[in-house]
Amino acid sequence: MELVAEFEKLQSHVPPFPGNEAKKIIEKETGKAIEELFQSFDETPFASASIAQVHFATLKDGSKVALKVRRPDIEEKIELDIDILKYMAKKMDEHHIMDQLDPQGIVRTFESAIHKEMNLVHEGYNLQRFAQNFAGSETVFIPKYYPEYTTKKLLTMEFVDGVHPYDREGLTRIGADGPVVAQQALAAMLRQICEFGFFHADPHPGNLFRSEEHTAELTSDSDIVCPLLLEKK
């Protein structure tokens, strides 16, 4: 259980980078000052994961949004990690270690997936597709995506407050039944795989919320929102 508790921190409690750096990234990506973009911007992130952190802001029209801002040095770190993995996989192949698993092939697949995950525009398109797939659903809610405020390093989506499925006290507070929430999440996952052929491939509790406002299972990403999506038909 101690290991589980430590790994849970990676979902949304990774040490954040300074909020003023996030502001600079947003301004550079959009070409506008923070004051031109938002009525308000909270420099303190409310979630922080391995690739990006999330800030609360209010658009000029009063819409509340969540801003996913990519870490400033993450690209270099990931490329270094990939180089290390490639070296290890090559050595494993040379010594015929786990040949049946194709170590170099696994690394190539990971490299392709992580590069997609790094492009937040790609994540925004995935959000749109999920929203289309679950349109009219009474158990799944997908936050609105704002493409005009999204770039490779910045994703803007509707802010919706919610409770993670592992937060039993939180679920009780909003009147949600844990087993029902689990059933809704499972049903949504099966629809993605069996009906849509397009599914969320990283549905850990940090990427799922139960929303009191919408009385539905809210799929999102504190990391943020649909961190890895695979198409399988």
Which role does the model predict for each range below?
Residues 217-233:
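Positively charged, low-complexity/disordered segments
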